[in-house]
Amino acid sequence: MSWLRHKRWIVWSVLAVAGGLLLSGTAEANVLCRLLPMRCTYEGAAFRFTVVDAETRQPLGEVHALAEWQLMGMYSGHGGPLMALDAVSGPDGQITFPAWGPIPGPHLMLGSDPVVTLLKSGYKTLRLANPSPPGTTETTRVRRFGRDGQTIALEPFRGIPDEWVEQLDQVWAGLAMRNQDDNRKFRDPYLNRVRRVWAERDKVPERHRVRPGFFWFVEQEMKRLEGTPK
């Protein structure tokens, strides 16, 4: 068999497998984005967890959770969000996120598929990476949150105001690298987070509220998101 004929045979074999997987509609169809120059297709499974006080073990309401499914950026760094959702716990401390997808996109980051940040006034902020199930790769179609059904404890904050700013700085704008299109698509969850952080401004010294203090940047981002059309 000549090299040209062999090359054609390889291409037609790949296309035949691709066609079969696409017609099957199964999760295995994401194998194709490893073999061909095409985007993967992703879905996020629904999940829930309960937030409690780390000392009293009582459920915590009004905990803001921001979940981001982060794409792989350049040089294997973190990129923008494929999906971003937010939720607030009720009196029972339960936070629930719905399923989403299918959505096409580049490779998702393991551990950030999703990454969830938690914010509640008077408590230390918390970042929850996703302990991916065994066998999960960057191209696995259905992404499940490894902490589904768990109880998450938040520690009361008893530090000084400067330390509270440090806590807020870790979660105030989410973790994904956003562009203008991301701001348009996911305006509400990010704006909800920024507004909750902005509400904490009176608890810190004035130097954090004026330029170039932390809350000056928070205000600029809040105005930018408020002015972004959906």
Describe each region flagged by the PLM.
Residues 38-40, 75-78, 105-109:
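Short consensus segments that form the blades of beta-propeller domains
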Residues 73-100:
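Short, acidic Ser/Thr/Gly-rich low-complexity loop/linker segments typical of extracellular
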Residues 104-135:
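A short, solvent-exposed loop/turn motif at the edges and junctions
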Residues 25-59, 175, 184, 188, ...:
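Beta-strand-rich domain onsets/edges
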Residues 30-40, 133-170:
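Extracellular beta-sheet/turn segments enriched in Thr/Pro/Gly and aliphatic residues
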Residues 2-15:
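N-terminal Sec-pathway targeting helices
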Residues 17-22:
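Hydrophobic core
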Residues 55-74, 175-180:
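Short, ordered, surface-exposed loop/turn motifs in non-cytosolic proteins
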